Amino acid sequence: MYRSSPFDLGSNITDFDAIRISLASPEKIRSWSHGEVTKPETINYRTFKPERDGLFCARIFGPVTDWECLCGKYKRMKHRGVICDKCGVEVTLSKVRRERLGHIELASPCSHVWFFKGLPSRIGHILDISLRDLESVLYFEAYVVVEPGDAPVKEREVIKDETKFRELDQQYRPTGFKALMGAEAIKELLKRVDAESLSVELREKMKNETSIQKRLKFAKRLKVAEAFRKSTNKPQWMILDVIPVIPPELRPLVPLDGGRFATSDLNDLYRRVINRNNRLKKLMDLHAPEVIVRNEKRMLQEAVDALFDNGRRGRVLRGANNRPLKSLSDTLKGKQGRFRQNLLGKRVDYSGRSVIVVGPELKLHQCGLPKKMALELFKPFIYHRLEQTGHCTTIKQAKELVEQQEPVVWDILEEVIKDHPVLLNRAPTLHRLGIQAFEPVLVEGKAIKIHPLVCTAFNADFDGDQMAVHIPLSPEAQIEASVLMLASHNILSPASGQPITVPTQDMVLGMYYLTKARPGSKGEGRAFANIEEVLLAKEMGEVETLTPIRLRYTGDVMDLTTAYDDQDVTHTEPVPFQRQYINTTVGRAILNDNLRRATAEMPYINGLLKKKGIGNLVNYVYLRFGLEITVQMLDQIKSLGFQYATRSGLSIGIDDMVISPNKAKVVKEAEQTVNSVQQQYLDGAITNGERYNKVVEIWSAITEKVADEMFGNMQQMDKAGEINPIYVMADSGARGSKQQIRQLSGMRGLMAKPSGEIIETPITANFREGLTVLEYFISTHGARKGLADTALKTADSGYLTRRLVDVAQDVIISEYDCGTVDGIYVSSIVESGEIIEPLRDRVIGRVSLEKIKDYEGNVVVDVNQEVTEDLANGIAAAGIERVKIRSVLTCESKRGVCALCYGRNLASGRLVELGEAVGVIAAQSIGEPGTQLTMRTFHIGGTASRVSEQSRLDAKNNGTARFHNLTVVRAKEGHLVVMNRNGAITVIDEKGREKERYAVVYGAKLRVEDGQQVKLGQVMVEWDPYTFAILTEIGGAVGFKDLHEGLTLHEEVDEVTGLSRHVVMDSPDEKRQPAIVIKGAKGTKRYLMPSRAHLMVLDGEEVFPGDVLAKIPRETTKTKDITGGLPRVVELFEARKPRETAVISEIDGTVKFGEVSKGQRKIYVVADDGTEREYSVPRGVHVNVQEGERIQAGEQLMDGPLNPHDILAVLGEKQLQSYLVNEIQEVYRLQGVNISDKHIETIVRQMMRWVKVEDVGDTNFLLEQQVDKFRFRAENEAAIASGGRPATGRPLMLGITKASLSTDSFISAASFQETTRVLTEASINGAVDHLRGLKENVIVGRLIPAGTGMEYYRNVALSPELEAQAQQVQEEVHQAYEEAERALELLRNEGEDETGNEELVAE
């Protein structure tokens, strides 16, 4: 495909639809080649010219300098295409040395290491020879039978014994016996393979085979046979006769100073091959002894292996400084490989980088660009404009003007950058808002100025961060930048739909100060007729900014001071006022005066605005007034915030850290409580573990109490009108948190040991008082761990993002409606009775699947209608519990997803458009906070924050208590005790609607009866969170079974207290099953005792229903690491099986216990129809179910995490999908990160696209093959249509890494991971990549098929009038391009034209 003429460069090679990869036949390799390389020499040591027929030969690969042959006989362009008769070099461009290949003819065939050694061995599979035997044949250690003749051996049998071979050879050679060794033998065998008949034969064998082991083996072989059958590849091409030599410029030899050369490793590897090949040729010509020739052939084979993949087999070849040589495979692999370094990540021109500083005077769509940078970046535009305006006539003159920085140049620069957006990017670019477009404003100095409000999106601060600038060149690029990427168009986060350009830090502080009321200020309580009077009084000094006043007002007023949530601007209804008085402050009047400049319809906002309130205000304005007004208002708030933060003069000093006066008293009380707990322990009432837990609990509570008191004090001072800057900063949300202030002026609290346990003696001091040496020492560990973790987790999170992007990159909105009839149900998320996320928030921006009706039967939302904010409020008002919506999980689009299943594009607030790359957006939205999760430790400095255990449930509403599925017994004290695990208690209002629902734990004490009226705050349930109790359901006498001292029981004597208690232990004899049997009037009942249970009763004792028989202490709590559950997220996305998973029941039924064998206890679940399932649970693990209890499918039989694959098998796809989405959301929710469900659903959809074939039927699938769902369905439909039997399969969930590697596109998979494996597989299959995803297109250098590059938007026809205009524009553009081309050509020829180009005047 090479082209020697430079004038053919215009012809386009991007005009193709697909790329195929396959094995190259020897003929193909020879046809690529421009000549055979026969000498190992590179360049001549004296002349530095390439040696003839060597690795850099100019005759084969092309001239070293443009338009010049090697000997210098032909120079200049006029001899184009001539082949020099003296040196044989063609006169052409030297860059053909980047594209011309050579070849090496091997004296003896060699195997290709990928196909022989890559697992599974393709050569081995197709010949049915084991890898070890194959290796011994290829490396001349054994013979393989090619022709058995009459000998008692089979074809392909491997003979390892030399003497045996000799005997057979002597005896049977006349009858045609032939055995060979080396690649020749294998090649001979491969030639005879007929893929077609092999395929048929294997399918027959599979049908008749009963052993699963053998069937799987046949399936593996069949896979390789099918690959050859379907592709044009021939098996013998896996053995090489000819090796291609890649172009010399791609394996350069660079002169260093000092006369030495740096060379690419490939040259060394090629030299080895050539040397050994030449030596082998000589030996063969000399008819050398077989042994020597064989040895040489083996060495040649090893050299070829090393060239293709160094270190795959045998020793790694090392270079001069003991560094392994980089082979061809290594050039492709890894982050530094061809794919990731050069194809996916290219460096671009017209870019620069510099330090950033804040530019508070900028508008949201502007950035400050240093003049020096702008001058360099916009050079071509300046040259062109200088020529146009007649300031100069040639490019050369323009260049001189710019270099001398003439005054006219600056004016031209101003003109050029007007309306020419630039892109700013801050690394790491974690989501799409890491690159935004701005209109440049020229600034002095060398720093880029950026608007303070975009810092959140870029995650930028001004402690030395740098940013890169890129210039969009083509008109299309400029339009896209200003329409799609302008900072003022990107104020919503694509992850959650919340505003992301929200004021932070100083601005929040200023706004808080401005809207604060300070009693006792000058002029308090004065009444004003309108805002203008207030401003006048302020100017005259009659009132202060914080003075509370009364203002007469006409218009809408949003009074946050009376609202339930005083920051909830979005949901507070404005009330119309008619010349009525508002109690407000001067500052709030100033704020509203400013806000009304953006729009006159703005309601008067009366309230103290904190960070959350300002965020909600931005959201409110965006929803009500749209983008333009929001942007104006943001700039108003920015200016006001900075202005008043400055005017307030807030600063902090040590006296602002107010220590609560009765801190000492509280701490003393705590010490007394701890001592009493210690005493209980000494008396033997509690175990050591319980003591520890209680002590930790006490100190946690005290730390909170001290902090609350301190905060309360600050609040009192604040109300009294004394401003405490530290309190103001934390309360406003500008900087610092309650936790940090607690450490400054409360107490530092509990710290963690390096092992992660909590040290039970807390640091009672704070930073203001100062720490003792011991306290300081205890603190250091936490602080250091924080720093170390941050560094490690950032890398993990980045890798997670990479995998997510890879698995979802080709999910694009491909059609408007896929016509599915399936959807998912959503309802509010409730955790321990609290509504964490109301239904209203979950359905906004989704599309309803069916009519949503209220209880009267009125339609609230229609079919396929997008649920807007108003409709969602309607749903909430109607009290609807759950709705069915469309989701990407149930979308039927074969490629990508459809707009209706996806719903709203969160970044724009409208229904998603065709071509939107929602997969990448989803991946970024999940990955970006991953880095945030990981960087979180940092600030709290390792203080142990334990989630204090909940031990009771209080009613949150008035209503009626109802029990659901609760089994209870009445204890002797008269209260009810819960005896099962899957029950719940709810509170119902007078209309019968469920207001709250709580799952109730086993062993909990109920403080209410079924149907009892409860009041708000009433205790309903209590339990002990630190131990797990086993209770009796019946009264009677205790009898021990298999509980013998020393065998299954041991007495633990506490060293401190001297008291003993019995603890159950594992017995070496498996027949013994420790249990307590209660014999009562109502019969007998047996309770199995797990190991580590502490017995609370004695043999023969009398017990009553609900009494505790044994306690199992819970593990002592360790502090939650800041992995922020990052490992948990990875575990879920990778579909890993967690360690020690819980066994779940596959059927509904009744529990029956079996015997223990081999360390496993058998549990049977018997269904109503008598079928039973058997489960094995490790002995000594606490079993969650009682004998005779009824359980449902999917219920856990023991404690532990669930295995997602089990959920899929037992409960099906929908259950698993909702499990994954909720589990992942939970991790993020704990961190306070808001991500829309649809992003997680998008990734989960990609994980669950697969089916594993269990029975092939009459289709072309293979057993155990994993297939795309849609392809599976299509093949089955085809099979049924032709009267065959369809295949059956089971749904399969793949982790994101596996799913990425299973994609149709081999280019995408190879650039992700395991490059060699992917390419080996693809080339055998003759795989065709249709370039449908994003990555493949980036790699081959085309526009990505998403966004404006989507097919749908290409080839759009225009009306005739527009057509004419477009034609004209096109001609003008074409003309401009031609001028530029001419100018470039002149610049190129400047150096070599003798005439000089001063006289050449371009028009």
Curated annotation (Swiss-Prot):
GO terms for biological process: DNA-templated transcription. SUPFAM superfamilies: beta and beta-prime subunits of DNA dependent RNA-polymerase. One of its GO terms (cellular component) is DNA-directed RNA polymerase complex. Its cofactor is Mg(2+); Zn(2+). It catalyses: RNA(n) + a ribonucleoside 5'-triphosphate = RNA(n+1) + diphosphate. Zn(2+) 2 binds at residues 818, 891, 898, 901. Residues 1384-1403 are annotated as: Disordered. It comes from the Bacteria. Binds 1 Mg(2+) ion per subunit. Its EC number is 2.7.7.6. DNA-dependent RNA polymerase catalyzes the transcription of DNA into RNA using the four ribonucleoside triphosphates as substrates. Belongs to the RNA polymerase beta' chain family. This is DNA-directed RNA polymerase subunit beta'. It comes from Koribacter versatilis (strain Ellin345). The lineage of its organism: Bacteria, Pseudomonadati, Acidobacteriota, Terriglobia, Terriglobales.
